[in-house]
Amino acid sequence: MQRSAGILLPVSSLPSPYGIGCFSQEAYDFVDWLKDAGQTYWQILPLGVTSYGDSPYQSFSAFAGNPYFISLDELVKEGVLTAEECKKAKFGRKADDIDYSQLYKERGRLLRLAYSRSDIGHNAEFAAFCEQNKWWLDDFALFMAVKDRFEGKPWIEWAEDIRLRWQNAMDYYRRELYFEVEYYKYLQFKFDQQWRALKAYANEKGIRIIGDIPIYVALDSADAWANPQMFQLDEDNIPTAVAGVPPDGFSPTGQLWGNPLYRWEKHRETGYQWWITRLWYCFELYDVVRIDHFRGFDEYFSIPYGSETAAPGHWEKGPGIELFRAVEQALGKREIIAEDLGYMSETVRQLVRDSGFPGMKVLEFAFDSRDTGSASDYLPHNYPVNSVAYTGTHDNETLVSWYQTITSAERALVRDYLCDYATPEAQLYKSMIALIFRSAATCIIPMQDWLGLDNSARINKPSTVGENWRWRLKKSQLTPKLQKEICSITTRYGRMNWA
């Protein structure tokens, strides 16, 4: 990756009058703002369909897009909704918060209304989209329609015939739920249209999109339901083991994610075709792809299904470099960022080196005794050119709140490293951002850190549910003053996007 800079901001966190950030004019305005701030990258979180915990890392599909991101204004322009209908909808009270329960009710109602008026069955572009994407779209749309029929229950709790995909049941539900299936295909068609238009606009402005994919699929996903042989499921399609990570300084019982683990021997037998296809599709949507939990390709933490915590888990070997050799042979060299944070064994480090992918460096980890990695790896003077540096990620505290929660001794270390004993604590985050801008690595800064916000703007606190993935940026926060500051530091340290 070239010497450059970017901003991390989930699509969901964009300003919007419709309850959640989406592919509306505000997204295009943000692209313009990034360009004028001298940025090269816009890093986002996964775009998948979110489920009960609202996490983009637990999606109903590895391929489908989140219909919440569909611009209602575009549907108004198409004549399938009216501006008054959108204005009357109640999406939530706060401009800086996402109320997912209201979104589910109101967005769902409006999207169904749009579908009912669309006459989509006579749309040649829709027919072509369905044909080109039937390899994932047919299973996904049927999965969602059947899920609605079973009142939202996970697929492992459905009736046996459709849970195990008996042919007579598949045929029955395709006939019985035809219009529901078409509705879910329609949503994916609109998502695809609007996202590709936004990405094309960003690329025209010299802004490259860094997408993000979780290593695992959710258990309650069309992927696991349609391809049970590729996962560690028993003869009744119930998991035998699930994913997570062991205890560390941030979580004494570890993290129990609950995702089904891959049956890697099956993937190897097919030449890793599922993964090749998945990554090929990602590069249709993004310019660069960050793969979450990269260490899971070297070793993955296997937790017996039904465990209450991650503590009973153990490490097992993953596919290693063989997978990425197969991907490169099929797709050529692609730009991938390896999320290699936390405790890294020597074999994981070797996998990252062998892959040639840039790893990640997080400034907060350099001074935080709770982190299980090597602190020296995260000191900016040690960042290699082939790395991407962050103040923090979506899983971390904001820089301002992090500095307040570390010990006084750790705060002293920060001051010593900065050689800065005079800057007021409330402004020290700017010095820390400048610190990684001086490093050799590509720099990606979360929007909250540029704004100097506290943990009320934190995106996610791992191992918790209920208050995550909710923060939204207010349009008034995208000021010319901030843009000028970002442009100035970007220029000063040779990271300016002159495109």
Language-model features: locations:
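N-terminal regions that are enriched for targeting/export leaders
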Residues: M1-S12, Y28
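Alpha-amylase-like alpha-glycosidases and glucanotransferases acting on alpha-linked glucans and related
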Residues: P10, S16, D54-D192, V217-I444, ...
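Catalytic domains of carbohydrate-active enzymes, especially glycoside hydrolases
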Residues: Q25-T50, L285-Y286
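Surface-exposed amphipathic alpha-helices with a cationic face
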Residues: K35, W195-N203, E328, V352-R353
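Domain-scale activation on soluble regions of proteins
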Residues: D36, I162, A169-M170, W471, ...
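Outer-envelope exported proteins of Gram-negative bacteria
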Residues: L45, R208-I210, P214, V288, ...
